[in-house]
Amino acid sequence: MKYLPIDSNLFVKNRAKLAERMMPGSLAIFNANDVLPSNADGTMAFRQNNELFYFSGVDQEESILVLFPDSTVEKHREILFLRETNEEIAIWEGEKLTKETAYDTSGVKTVYWVQDFHKILRSIIYEAETIYLN
């Protein structure tokens, strides 16, 4: 464990502060940092994008946070996308967040697997007047 667990209320408050400062009709997308190769056989230690961690507490590669406070669909106001996990991934790469543990960590109620990102984004992006990208 890199650090002691952080109360998810901190991340809920951080997202609420951001939502207050966003322009009306705005959508914000925060992407995880990439896993960088060190050579042909290995990768460097993963370090999460600061903004994604600040707003969600998620410290996992291939994660995306979408904030859309003015969405007409309540469940699309905060969405977290994670890499789908299974027992084999846990053995070879280490334990990853499930949808339940992601909610416990971040306080984001709507969690999808990252392979659904384009489908979900396509359904909500037309409502947005402004888009923020990290």
Please report, for each region that a protein language model flagged, where it lies by residue:
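A composition/biophysics-driven feature that prefers long, compositionally simple stretches
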Residues: 1-134
